[in-house]
Design a protein with these regions (language model features):
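Flexible helix-coil transition and linker loops at the boundaries of alpha-helical arrays
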Residues: 34-46, 78-92, 123-134, 165-175, ...
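Helix-turn-helix repeat elements of alpha-solenoid scaffolds
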Residues: 20-35, 61-82, 106-124, 148-166, ...
Length: 426
């Protein structure tokens, strides 16, 4: 940002008068004033111009004007880059301006440009880490999520590996670390790196077990993790290890049904359940999508607005498709079950996402899980060879839902029936 070749001193006086007015300048007046003053004294006024531009971009009147907000953010980025490199907080101002620019680019659907901005942010934080010796990785997590939405799973997995390695020495809270490990494992699996995914998820299972044993974390979360771990092992052909994981899950659920949680827990069990449930259905979701997909293992609050909207907008279409096939269910049972599970999983994720009062959403979700079990029983009656495995899977889905709803006895009944269908009820 180069100074104007000619400075109008009347403009400078008016700019200073605006800033010193007793009523105070509006945000727009502040921007106009600092645009002028930054030409006179860039060292002092360029940082103030950056802050003023970003403040104006927050203005309520511009809430739905993403092109205008983007223009302000881009001007803020240019102003921040023009600040002398030796100025304190220059990089922090630039990082903040880039973050706002990234958000507006994504809001306008300009995802490739948004990714490029994120790459700049990651580079800035890496330079901070090299100078301070303390990793700065907030942009790295955003970068990984964005890469995963574009299907660039190998790059996303590498970014998440760096993220997890950076935050673990900082001793993050249990929920943050558990979700980070789940997201990393899911992204590794999406990248086809199944052995690494299993190793990452084993760390999560061990972490959950330790937290539950020490009464620091919910036993329900350990149950969900064991269920998902067994599914991963099955997918990799490790049938005996998968069966052993389900026996451990049975022991955890039996304790919950007998004594309940060992201590009163926070409301963070349902989000973890919803994350693992959506991950288990992610393969089918990707096959049905032709745009940005939600990253496996990440909650909807981490997704981009576009990915979130696409995911939830399909609920109405799924319901119509399910209702159409349900008019003659016996002709379409396998496809009906597949679509019904997609509908159930998306509905569960939506209910958990839109409110922290998850218990209030249970009446809406219960019929979906019950319908899924009834459809699977019909398939089992028509085709026991294929139906028993499907019924076991749907019963386990409902068991995890009932656990999230703190209906532990009913959850245990479902889980035991599922193990019986799999021949694992010994």
């Amino acid at each position: 940002m180069s100074p104007s070749p000619k400075i109008d001193h009347d403009d400078v006086l008016r700019a200073r008068a605006k800033l010193l007015a007793t009523t105070g300048p509006t945000r727009r007046e502040e921007v106009e004033a600092y645009r002028v003053l930054a030409q006179v004294n860039p060292a002092t006024h360029l940082p103030r111009l950056v802050n003023a531009l970003l403040s104006l971009s927050y203005d309520h009147g511009l809430r739905d004007s993403h092109p205008l907000r983007l223009a302000l953010c881009e001007e803020a980025v240019a102003a921040a880059r023009a600040i002398d490199p030796g100025t304190p907080d220059r990089e922090k101002l630039l990082f903040r301006a880039l973050l706002m620019c990234h958000r507006e680019l994504y809001a306008l659907g300009r995802r490739a440009e948004g990714l490029a901005v994120l790459a700049d942010m990651v580079a800035i934080e890496r330079s901070w880490g090299e100078l301070s010796g303390v990793p700065a990785v907030s942009a790295l997590h955003l970068w990984a999520t964005a890469l995963a939405e574009e299907g660039r799973h190998a790059e996303a997995a590498d970014a998440l590996a760096e993220w997890v390695a950076a935050i673990r020495p900082l001793r993050p809270d249990f929920d943050t670390l558990a979700r980070s490990l789940a997201e990393w494992a899911a992204t590794l699996a999406d990248a086809g790196r199944t052995d690494e995914a299993l190793s990452a998820f084993e760390v999560l299972v061990d972490l959950d077990a330790g937290e539950a044993t020490a009464d620091r974390g919910p036993l329900a979360c350990h149950f969900y993790a064991l269920v998902r771990y067994a599914e991963l092992l099955d997918g990799c052909g490790h049938a005996e290890r998968a069966a052993a994981a389900r026996q451990s899950a049975l022991a955890a659920l039996t304790e919950l049904a007998t004594t309940g949680e060992r201590k009163v827990q926070s409301g963070d069990q349902a989000p973890f359940w919803a994350i693992l449930l959506s991950w288990s259905a992610a393969d089918g979701e990707r096959l049905a999508s032709d745009g940005p997909c939600p990253p496996s293992g990440a909650g909807p609050r981490q997704w981009s607005a576009e990915a979130r909207q696409r995911y939830f907008d399909r609920l109405a279409t799924l319901r119509e498709q399910v209702n159409t096939l349900a008019e003659d269910p016996d002709r379409h049972l396998p496809e009906l079950l597949r679509l019904h599970r997609m509908l159930t999983v998306r509905s569960a994720v939506q209910c958990e996402h839109r409110t922290y009062a998850f218990a209030a959403q249970l009446p809406e979700l219960q019929p979906l899980f019950d319908e899924g079990v009834e459809l699977a029983r019909r398939l089992d009656a028509h085709d026991p060879a294929a139906g028993s495995r499907t019924l076991a899977e749907v019963l386990i889905d409902r068991s995890t839902f009932r656990t999230a709803a703190c209906r532990f006895d009913a959850a245990l009944g479902d889980f035991r029936e599922a193990l019986g269908l799999r021949g694992e009820d010994h």
